[in-house]
């Protein structure tokens, strides 16, 4: 299937959803997914939800807010309290699962409050082979993964993003700040803040 055929599949899948809440981090994948959802469904049927937390870089939250403002997207920022999740501070190997499960539960509730049928996230085909405990939470909570369903990989998403005029097409991938610490090293808000400030220099 060609890259443009895959995009047509993505568009149709999004149309079939009727309405969607996109988990929006301002990264390459979620920005592309949000743009595709807006094209498929229109602004009235799409909301973007971004988590504000000590493990999410401040500059990414700012970029997410700016993108939604520029594109007229309803943007809801929810407070994620991952450090309050039992076990998270100890930085176990399933850290991403714990965080994503809490986050997607919150996004699911926000979707219901706004009469939105589906929650969607931006994982792609390249994520299938990696160790991604967060995808277990996605499956458990019935969150949609439209980019994987359309069999789009990262390079194809970058190419289509460029065609759509998205400035994120060549944006560097990033992971949450908690990933800077080896498994088993205790995570604190102070440590995460230090990392965020250091990486913004």
Predicted regions and their residues:
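ATP-dependent adenylation/nucleotidyltransferase module used to activate substrates
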Residues: 1-163
């Amino acid at each position: 299937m060609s890259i443009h055929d895959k995009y047509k599949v993505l568009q149709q899948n999004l149309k079939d959803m009727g309405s969607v809440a996109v988990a929006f981090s301002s990264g390459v994948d979620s920005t592309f997914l949000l743009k595709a959802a807006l094209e498929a469904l229109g602004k009235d049927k799409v909301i973007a939800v971004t988590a504000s937390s000590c493990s999410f870089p401040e500059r990414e939250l700012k970029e997410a807010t700016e993108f939604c403002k520029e594109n007229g997207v309803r943007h809801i920022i929810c407070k994620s309290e991952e450090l309050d999740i039992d076990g998270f501070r100890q930085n176990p190997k399933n850290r991403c699962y714990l965080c994503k499960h809490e986050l997607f539960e919150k996004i699911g509730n926000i979707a219901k409050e706004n009469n939105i049928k589906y929650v969607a996230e931006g994982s792609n085909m390249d994520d299938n082979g990696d160790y991604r405990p967060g995808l277990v939470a996605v499956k458990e909570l019935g969150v949609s993964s439209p980019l994987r369903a359309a069999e789009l990989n990262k390079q194809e998403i970058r190419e289509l993003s460029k065609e759509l005029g998205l400035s994120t097409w060549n944006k560097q991938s990033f992971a949450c700040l908690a990933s800077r610490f080896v498994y088993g090293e205790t995570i604190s808000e102070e440590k995460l803040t230090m990392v965020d400030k250091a990486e913004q220099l």
